[in-house]
A protein has these predicted regions:
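Short aromatic-glycine-(Arg/Gly/Cys) micro-motifs in beta-strand/loop hairpins
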Residues: 1-16
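A short, exposed loop/beta-hairpin motif centered on an aromatic-Gly-Thr core
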Residues: 16-24
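C-terminal structural segments of small proteins and small subunits
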Residues: 46-80
Length: 80
Protein backbone atom coordinates (compact mmCIF):
# COMPACT_ATOMS: atom_id res chain seq x y z
CA UNK A 1 0.00 0.00 0.00
CA UNK A 2 1.18 3.50 -0.85
CA UNK A 3 0.19 6.86 0.64
CA UNK A 4 -1.37 9.38 -1.73
CA UNK A 5 -2.44 12.96 -1.03
CA UNK A 6 -5.60 14.37 -2.62
CA UNK A 7 -5.27 18.16 -2.89
CA UNK A 8 -8.31 20.25 -3.82
CA UNK A 9 -7.89 23.19 -6.21
CA UNK A 10 -10.58 25.85 -6.45
CA UNK A 11 -10.86 29.56 -7.11
CA UNK A 12 -9.39 30.28 -3.69
CA UNK A 13 -6.19 28.32 -4.27
CA UNK A 14 -5.11 24.85 -3.27
CA UNK A 15 -6.12 22.98 -0.15
CA UNK A 16 -3.37 20.48 0.56
CA UNK A 17 -4.20 17.08 1.96
CA UNK A 18 -1.53 16.71 4.63
CA UNK A 19 -2.72 13.33 5.94
CA UNK A 20 -3.29 11.36 2.74
CA UNK A 21 -4.88 7.97 2.14
CA UNK A 22 -3.50 4.53 1.46
CA UNK A 23 -4.14 3.04 -1.99
CA UNK A 24 -2.76 -0.06 -3.66
CA UNK A 25 -1.24 1.79 -6.63
CA UNK A 26 -1.42 4.90 -8.83
CA UNK A 27 -4.42 3.56 -10.76
CA UNK A 28 -6.39 3.06 -7.53
CA UNK A 29 -5.44 6.57 -6.39
CA UNK A 30 -6.69 8.00 -9.69
CA UNK A 31 -10.00 6.14 -9.26
CA UNK A 32 -10.28 7.58 -5.74
CA UNK A 33 -9.70 11.09 -7.14
CA UNK A 34 -12.61 10.57 -9.55
CA UNK A 35 -14.84 9.52 -6.64
CA UNK A 36 -13.80 12.61 -4.67
CA UNK A 37 -14.57 14.86 -7.66
CA UNK A 38 -18.03 13.32 -8.07
CA UNK A 39 -18.76 13.83 -4.36
CA UNK A 40 -17.66 17.48 -4.57
CA UNK A 41 -20.19 18.07 -7.35
CA UNK A 42 -22.89 16.18 -5.48
CA UNK A 43 -22.42 18.30 -2.36
CA UNK A 44 -21.63 21.64 -3.98
CA UNK A 45 -23.54 22.15 -7.19
CA UNK A 46 -26.64 23.53 -5.49
CA UNK A 47 -24.56 26.17 -3.73
CA UNK A 48 -23.01 27.71 -6.86
CA UNK A 49 -24.19 28.43 -10.37
CA UNK A 50 -20.72 27.61 -11.72
CA UNK A 51 -18.58 24.83 -10.28
CA UNK A 52 -14.90 24.43 -11.21
CA UNK A 53 -12.75 22.25 -8.97
CA UNK A 54 -9.87 19.85 -9.40
CA UNK A 55 -8.35 17.06 -7.37
CA UNK A 56 -4.60 16.76 -7.77
CA UNK A 57 -3.05 13.55 -6.50
CA UNK A 58 0.47 13.51 -5.10
CA UNK A 59 2.46 10.35 -4.52
CA UNK A 60 5.56 9.66 -2.43
CA UNK A 61 7.58 12.08 -4.60
CA UNK A 62 5.27 14.89 -3.33
CA UNK A 63 4.66 15.89 -6.96
CA UNK A 64 1.19 15.67 -8.56
CA UNK A 65 0.87 12.82 -11.06
CA UNK A 66 -2.78 13.23 -12.05
CA UNK A 67 -5.45 15.94 -11.99
CA UNK A 68 -9.18 15.24 -12.12
CA UNK A 69 -11.07 18.43 -12.97
CA UNK A 70 -14.82 18.92 -12.77
CA UNK A 71 -16.56 21.87 -14.40
CA UNK A 72 -20.33 22.17 -14.11
CA UNK A 73 -22.87 24.91 -14.66
CA UNK A 74 -26.25 25.02 -12.98
CA UNK A 75 -28.77 26.96 -15.04
CA UNK A 76 -32.51 27.23 -14.53
CA UNK A 77 -34.77 28.60 -17.26
CA UNK A 78 -38.43 29.22 -16.54
CA UNK A 79 -40.27 28.44 -19.76
CA UNK A 80 -43.75 29.51 -18.66
Amino acid sequence: MLRFHFDIKDGGGIHRDEHGEMCTDHQAAEAEAVKIAVEMVRHGIGQWTHFDRAVEVRDESDEPFVRVRVVAKLETQRLK
